[in-house]
Amino acid sequence: MPSSPTSTRKQTNFTASVSAQSRKSISFGNPKSTGGKGYAGANQSKIVASRTMTFLPEMKPAEKLNIASAKLVQVLDPRGVDVTPRPLYHPDPHAMPTKPSKLLTSQEGSMGSDYISSYSLYQNTLNPSMLGQYTRSVIGSSSTVSKSSISTTESMTEDLEDPSYKRDRLASFADVRVMRAPAEAAITKEELERNVEIFLMETETLRFFDLPTVMISTDSEEAEKVIEKNINYEILCRNRLGNDLYVERMMQTFNGAPKNKDVQCDKIIMEEKGVMATTWDLYDSFNIPEASLAAKRSAYLSKASLLVRDRDPKIQDSESSSLMDIESVILAKSHEDEEDNSEKILKSDKLHQDLFYMERVLMENVFQPKLAAYRQLPIYKELEPGQPEEDLQVVNKVTEDEVKKDEEEEMETELEIEITTEQSTIPANLERLWSFSCDLTKGLNVSSLSWNKANSDLLAVGYGNFGFKEQKRGMACCWSIKNPMWPERIYQSPYGVTSVDFSISSPNLLAVGYHNGTVAIYNVQSNHNTPVLDSSESPQKHLGPVWQVQWIEQDRGTTGDDRREILVSISADGRISKWVIRKGLDCHDLMHLKRTTVTSSKKGIEKEKKGEALISRQAPGMCFAFHTKDTNIYLAGTEEGLIHKCSCSYNEQYLETYRGHKGPVYKVTWNPFCPDVFLSCSADWGVMIWHQDNVKPFFTFYPTTYVVYDVAWSPKSAYIFAAANENRVEIWDLQISTLDPLIVNVANPGIKFTTVLFAKQTDCLLVGDSDGQVAVYELRNMPTPTESGRGDVINVLLGPKAN
């Protein structure tokens, strides 16, 4: 292949050896050829062009110094100071800046084949795909190598061999200051193994509200698609009903596990307020302001009557509105004064006392027939309204009957005989009058009843459970016959009340025994709920439930005129104690109940029967009863089923022991007419009548298979007593029968009778149950007591056994 022409300015042989000068060539040839250098174009004529370009060697150091020593242009001011402007651009001395050349520009405004030859400077072969968009212009420029291409090659050689470019580059090296990065220190092995602490901190949580819209404007591009989609959905819903293409299927979804959260808030305080307006309040509030307003209005109108006709109607309207404002101000002031007075009135003690008596009057009107039957008074029927003439006729007839009273005396005697015969045919029964109960006593067990010694209309009731595991809150209430709907006094306690009793010498004192062993004394005259005295801090307090408390008057001297009152209590800890009121409650033990061994007689020889070892030497006490005449003697019932006769003078031994019951003795009471006879009941379902001179019972009654909780003698007959079983109340009359009770009253399902008590002055019986109710029953058609001595009658009934 012939060599390409070289530049005319420098006649340098391009084929010289490599050691003489550095050579770089750009050749175009067939890429498949291994010996030659060339380029295969995309032209159909397959014209091959070969060029060889030679670059000048690098400049010598002497030339560099000459170029650097060349002084640049300096600007001096009149004083001779160098004010030459500093260059804004400082090129990197280590970077090889691109030489401004004409490689990428064509002489004729378009790129030719010479550009392609320079592009393959460091490549032996060039793929046509690398030419890109320039392939078309290069191939389509000409099919043969023209003179213009030769001239272009010559210009390229001039640009490559132009020493001015290198001089400019060396000159820029002298003015540029290079800042090199400091060399990084080598990391040792210890530094690599060192623990590095990394602290992770939570960034602030940013919340962005994003609510995608569900509406699209009708002018938007998506409006047509949305409208079409909605129309298709409506058509789908219409075609779904009755279509065979749709089938209903059941799906099961998983609900997330619920999470409970506790929220605590302040206590909400509720207050109830009531307002009462009576007719006279309304009358005063409307009439008094109107009178004052009328006087002021008349005075005001009299002064302005001369100018009314000449005034504008607007002025008249303003005057009427001002009068209305004055009236409203006066009414508001009067209401404020009434509110201030009403608060004082509602908080006054006088109002509370008046309301207390008013409530009693209303209750007596409501319960008038029942109260009349309780007091054994005639019952008056209410007169029907609208018949005053008939009432007057009745009154006149009553007066006429009183005049003819003498004439009818003989007739009355005959009628009495007939009435007695009729009463003998009608059996005795119980009629319920009312019950003492309220919301506070609902569900509580009535444990004890006691009448006030001075006021027979006042009744004390204790509420508490007998079982140890059934303990709830306790309460002691004072009820009055005049108000059966709400108690007069309420003494609440966290412990159950087991016994209550009023004092004899001081009727205002109420003794209360609790299940925790405390004995408390309340003053019923005051409204305070705190006890006057109690044994909660006494070192000698009971350690078990106090099953009974009773006030006893004991003789001090031999004559019996001087008496003092003591409070006696019996507890499950086996102690019978007396309490004396001094500065506090002083306790003294009357008896320590001890367990006794069972003895049996065989062939006249008494032998002690061996029993099991006793867990406790103390016998729990359940009840006691002091003799009606000799207050130094008393009976004590125990949990063993024994009844001990004790004396206040001996506290170590018993006077007598009565054996008959097989279970705990719940109640012992003396006959009020025969002081030697007493009555007892037990958990062994039995009721027994005893004589104090005989250790065996005279009568034993086992009418049912239920526990007998309480018994009581009648205050009007020595033969009659009442017993409270679990499911019924029995009235016994020993004069009529000793086998069957005279009256039986069965309890409601789920209710147990617990206590009984006779009224003092009337033929009524009070029965307490397990639901917190104290029912009052009237004894009707009871047999009249005999006229003979009642004390002798019971002795005659007992027969020779009592002697």
Swiss-Prot record:
Subcellular location: Cytoplasm, Cytoskeleton, Flagellum axoneme; Cytoplasm, Cytoskeleton, Cilium axoneme; Dynein axonemal particle
Protein name as it appears in the record: Dynein axonemal intermediate chain 4
InterPro entries: Dynein_IC, WD40/YVTN_repeat-like_dom_sf, WD40_repeat_dom_sf, WD40_rpt
Known partners and oligomeric status: Part of the multisubunit axonemal dynein complex formed at least of two heavy chains and a number of intermediate and light chains. Associated with axonemal dynein subunits such as, DNAH2, DNAI3, and DYNLT1. Interacts with DYNLT1.
Coiled-coil annotated spans: none
Ranges of compositional bias, category Polar residues: 1-33
Pfam family, one: WD40
GO BP terms in the entry: axonemal dynein complex assembly; cilium movement; hematopoietic progenitor cell differentiation
Source organism, top-level taxon: Eukaryota
Region (Disordered): 1-41, 88-109, 143-163
Ranges of compositional bias, category Low complexity: 143-155
Job description of the protein: Plays a critical role in the assembly of axonemal dynein complex, thereby playing a role in ciliary motility.
Assigned keywords, A-Z: Cell projection, Cilium, Cytoplasm, Cytoskeleton, Flagellum, Repeat, WD repeat
Any one of the GO CC terms: axoneme
